[in-house]
Design a protein with these regions (language model features):
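Peripheral interaction segments used for macromolecular assembly
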Residues: 1-93
Length: 93
């Protein structure tokens, strides 16, 4: 098992070796299971995935954990960059 604090800041890479960004937060359900990772996108990923970069700050997507293939020095996804285009941006409540 890995501590949540050790996940934050880890790089997130697609299965085709595209650097998506890094984990900024995790979302949990009522049973304390991680349901989504919030990934702060790189500038390149923001453009590649079709998001508009805000004047200040970054775009963050909410990626369901079933898309994670492996956790090590980096987070490896089971999707390629094209398959990420349907992942929504995280909206603040």
């Amino acid at each position: 098992m890995i501590e949540i604090s050790k996940l934050k800041g880890k790089l997130v890479i697609t299965k085709d070796s595209f650097n998506v960004g890094e984990i900024s937060e995790v979302n949990m359900d009522d049973d304390w299971r991680i349901t989504h990772i919030q990934v702060r996108l790189t500038k390149e990923a923001t453009n590649e995935l079709g998001f508009k970069k805000p004047l200040l700050g970054h775009v963050t997507i909410c990626l369901p954990v079933y898309n994670v293939r492996g956790v090590g020095d980096v987070i490896t996804l089971s999707r390629n960059r094209v398959e990420l285009k349907d992942i929504p941006e995280c909206k603040s409540e």
